[in-house]
Regions:
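Start-of-domain signal
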Residues: 18, 43-67, 73, 80-89, ...
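N-terminal secretory signal peptides that target proteins for export/translocation
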Residues: 1-14
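Boundary of Sec targeting at the N-terminus
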Residues: 39-40
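N-terminal signal peptide c-region/cleavage motif recognized by signal peptidases
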Residues: 33-34
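Sec-dependent N-terminal signal peptides
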Residues: 14-27
Length: 210
């Protein structure tokens, strides 16, 4: 994933930057295509930026989406400390992966399949770690392991994005810069470091402006 670094010095610029980033995120979410929104789990609003980025990936493979959403939707049980329910969800997620693994792998381009297999091994370990955290009723540990496991699932999902995928842009915007894909921006300010992801899959012109 390409990276760029920019520098701003004053607190006023830092405040304006935060406003720009908020607009970017809002614009990116508004411009997500209907199929991406359809993949979002129903019920509670999705607020985790990492989950939103996973859901916005343009690919068509329902099994790994279900795997992702099952883990993401453990938040309510975790807040209520319903450890028995959490244990059942993790076990069912593990069973789902075992039965759908080959189907998911077959959807990954052959050249990337070895990478996907290695990532699934990490997901396997992550699910084992989650079961241990459930047994220990370790809430902070469960959150950390879930975040890491979902990150590996997201990496597999990124491999499912069609090669050369580009969002169609009207011809009148041909002169504008655009980003097809995603980029991570590391931004240094007097208030500290900021890291943000700009999503060219769904808002290529907004992302290209950075």
């Amino acid at each position: 994933m390409p990276k760029s670094r920019q520098h701003w010095g004053s607190p006023l610029v830092h405040q304006r930057l935060n406003a720009v980033l908020a607009v970017l995120i809002s614009f990116a979410l508004i411009t997500i295509a209907a199929p991406a929104w359809a993949a979002l789990p129903q019920g509670n609003a999705v607020k985790d930026p990492a989950a939103i980025l996973r859901d916005a990936l343009p690919f068509d493979q329902d099994d790994i989406r279900e795997l992702q959403h099952r883990l993401e939707l453990t938040s309510d049980d975790l807040r209520a400390k319903r450890w028995t329910a959490l244990g059942k969800t993790v076990s069912r997620t593990e069973s789902l992966l075992n039965t759908r693994r080959d189907t998911i792998l077959n959807a990954v381009p052959e050249a990337k399949r070895g990478t996907a297999e290695a990532l699934f091994e990490r997901v396997d370990q992550g699910l084992e770690d989650l079961k241990e955290k459930v047994k220990a009723t370790d809430k902070p540990g469960f959150i950390a392991d879930r975040r890491r496991t979902l990150s590996f699932i997201g990496d597999v999902e990124a491999l499912l994005v069609p090669e050369g995928f580009e969002r169609e842009i009207p011809a009148e915007f041909d002169a504008l810069p655009r980003l097809q894909g995603r980029a991570t921006l590391n931004i240094s300010t007097t208030q500290g470091e900021l890291t943000t992801v700009v999503d060219g899959y769904n808002a290529p012109l907004t992302a290209g402006a950075f």
